[in-house]
Amino acid sequence: MKPDESPQYWDSISRTFTKDAHHSLWRSHSDQINMSLLEDWLGSRQVTNLLKTDLFDEAVSLGLYPLLSEHAGGVYGIDLAAESADEAKKQFPELEAVCADVRKLPFSDNQFDLIVSNSTLDHFQSKKEIDVGFQELFRVLGEGGELLISLDNLQNPIVGLRNLLPYRLLNRLKLVPYFVGKTFGRRGFAAALEKAGFEVLETKAIMHCPRVFAVAVSGILQRRASEKSQRRFLAFLQQFEFFGRLPTRFFTGYFVAIRARKPADPQSKKP
């Protein structure tokens, strides 16, 4: 395990974001983007057991737990960082928070009816590790269950350029706050899920605002602007999601989101 993938590293990132309130306005926008997607895909669905594959959102902001808990009898969450799992549990006592690696899940086969994974598996050094994560998600998801998953979008030119440059340089220039790893474009993402046995049902591109600009302005407004001005800025950022309806959406979106299903007869989908 590389230093940037270690639990200790992600513990330090969790501590930084938990203590730094300057990130909260941007985190609110990020949460809203993810909640809008999930509201669309979940509808009125109710499940027994739901798994969320990291707890960073719930450790540093409200995250997705309030929405997910409306749709599931039990919500489980994992995180490689014990600090994130602990902070999320403090905020949401009914959450079943577990310190674990998505590549080696401590759960039984077919345990979950639904899995939500927002930008968890795009922090690894290799695509092979992402494939291992997909295989584990397939294992613990019940037959007919759905996986709602997003990754950094390699088709976005900014993301593509970022992934060509050394992480140490980007971090030193404060362009990325934590390690970002390998990822896919839309077609490669879908192909990798299908290789793991999933049936891809729907693909979307999300988060279309100019991210570097938006993060920088969010930090300034968080420190200096009134709550009313901050709300207006969040509404302004939300307008960029219009680009998700255009043919160019997979070039402007920073994330690719896929709704996939584990077939009732999963062996029929395995290569």
Question: What are these model-derived regions, one by one?
Answer:
Residues 180-197, 203:
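Short alpha-helix
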Residues 131-146:
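A short glycine-rich, Lys/Arg-flanked "PGG" loop and its adjoining helix->strand segment in the class I
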Residues 29, 171-188:
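Acceptor-substrate binding/catalytic loop of class I
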Residues 116:
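A conserved beta-strand element that flanks and buttresses the S-adenosyl-L-methionine
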Residues 202-271:
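A C-terminal cap/extension of S-adenosyl-L-methionine-dependent methyltransferases
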Residues 51-104:
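Class I SAM-dependent methyltransferase SAM/SAH-binding core
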Residues 1-46, 148-170:
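Conserved class I S-adenosyl-L-methionine
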